[in-house]
């Protein structure tokens, strides 16, 4: 399971022109679910995402996590993250989970996040338009 996390000052996701999720200070989490992922991996990744220190302390060091800054999380499904891009000029998607499994684990991950801090989410498998202001920019690839 993969989370591409971005520290944002704001982020929103729209479906058919309607805002379905929106946050101010926090993390935009693009979530990719792989074939062998399960609830244990989702829980471990949620713990990493919500405790990963990407926000600056009083000394300017990235020493604080999203919970410590009273931030929020916006979780957006991103089926292209597990893609195989090692060869050629077209990505292969065989490493991604079956859509039904991916949706179940995406919902599970998002539900776990909601238990920890304010969480918004995109709409699984929808054509989404994601806007953000990346603060830094600060972006990390987390994988379990």
From Swiss-Prot:
Question: Cross-referenced InterPro entries, in alphabetical order?
Answer: Daa-tRNA_deacyls_DTD (IPR003732), DTD-like_sf (IPR023509)
From the UniProt record, list the reaction(s) this protein catalyses. Answer: glycyl-tRNA(Ala) + H2O = tRNA(Ala) + glycine + H(+); a D-aminoacyl-tRNA + H2O = a tRNA + a D-alpha-amino acid + H(+)
The source's superkingdom equals Bacteria
Q: Name one GO cellular component term.
A: cytoplasm
* Molecular function terms from GO: D-tyrosyl-tRNA(Tyr) deacylase activity; Gly-tRNA(Ala) deacylase activity; Ser(Gly)-tRNA(Ala) hydrolase activity; tRNA binding
Gly-cisPro motif, important for rejection of L-amino acids, short sequence motif: residues: 136-137
Q: Which SUPFAM superfamilies does the record cross-reference, listed alphabetically?
A: DTD-like
Q: Which UniProt keywords apply?
A: Cytoplasm, Hydrolase, RNA-binding, tRNA-binding
User: What's any GO biological process attached to this entry?
Assistant: D-amino acid catabolic process
What the record says about family reads: Belongs to the DTD family.
What this protein is reported to do is described as:
An aminoacyl-tRNA editing enzyme that deacylates mischarged D-aminoacyl-tRNAs. Also deacylates mischarged glycyl-tRNA(Ala), protecting cells against glycine mischarging by AlaRS. Acts via tRNA-based rather than protein-based catalysis; rejects L-amino acids rather than detecting D-amino acids in the active site. By recycling D-aminoacyl-tRNA to D-amino acids and free tRNA molecules, this enzyme counteracts the toxicity associated with the formation of D-aminoacyl-tRNA entities in vivo and helps enforce protein L-homochirality.
Q: How does it assemble?
A: Homodimer.
Protein name (database record): D-aminoacyl-tRNA deacylase
Q: Which organism is it from?
A: Vibrio parahaemolyticus serotype O3:K6 (strain RIMD 2210633)
Encoded by which gene? dtd
